[in-house]
């Protein structure tokens, strides 16, 4: 967690103190463009929202090899925390493979294929299958996966992910909608819908 101006020590402070069983770890630096969302709204609940979204036009989400090594040590080795490795593109899968080869991560690896964030791989069935094929090649049988397809693509690609052998993840963090134009009332509503589908 944490903000983009925080050091790795600041970003990991809560995890080091609370020692969670699992936390996410992004497998590389990337552009993380949320700014197109600012063009879709005229009214804001909070004054900071448009500036924050527009600020992502000139923002790099930083996770260097050194950052990742530090987090693997400080939260993983020293704290006993397992990781959900977030991969926003195929290069991130290769980065995870690098850490696996070096023995800095141990199977089973929990991989989250993240699709649909501007700056990462697009949200499509073809891209999800490409991510899966790449992970099969690079990680072999050392991993389990789930899918996060930001926004309107979530249920469709989570369903495909399940068909491909992945675990299922749904919730308001990933999509605010239960159907086209219809806001979800709760996480439970999304869980019930994916249970009906699968």
Model-inferred region functions:
Residues 22-172, 184-189:
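Catalytic alpha/beta core domains of metabolic enzymes, predominantly
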Residues 1-19, 122, 128-134:
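N-terminal active-site wall of soluble small-molecule enzyme domains
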Residues 192-198:
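Mid-to-C-terminal alpha-helical segments outside catalytic/metal-binding sites
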């Amino acid at each position: 967690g944490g903000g983009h101006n925080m050091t790795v020590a600041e970003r990991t402070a809560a995890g080091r103190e609370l020692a969670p069983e699992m936390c996410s770890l992004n497998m590389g630096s990337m552009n993380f463009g949320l700014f197109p969302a600012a063009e879709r709204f005229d009214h804001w609940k909070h004054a900071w929202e448009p500036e924050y979204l527009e600020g992502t036009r000139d923002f790099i989400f930083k996770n260097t090899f050194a950052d990742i090594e530090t987090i693997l040590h400080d939260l993983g080795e020293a704290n006993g925390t397992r990781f959900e490795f977030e991969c926003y593109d195929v290069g991130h899968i290769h980065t995870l493979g690098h850490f696996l080869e070096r023995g800095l991560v141990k199977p089973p690896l929990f991989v989250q294929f993240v699709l649909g964030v501007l700056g990462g791989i697009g949200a499509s069935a073809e891209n999800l299958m490409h991510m899966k094929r790449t992970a099969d090649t690079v990680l072999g049988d050392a991993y389990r996966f789930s899918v996060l397809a930001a926004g309107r693509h979530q249920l469709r690609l989570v369903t495909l992910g399940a068909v491909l052998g992945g675990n299922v993840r749904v919730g308001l963090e990933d999509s605010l909608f239960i159907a086209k134009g219809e806001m979800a009332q709760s996480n439970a509503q999304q869980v019930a819908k994916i249970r009906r589908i699968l």
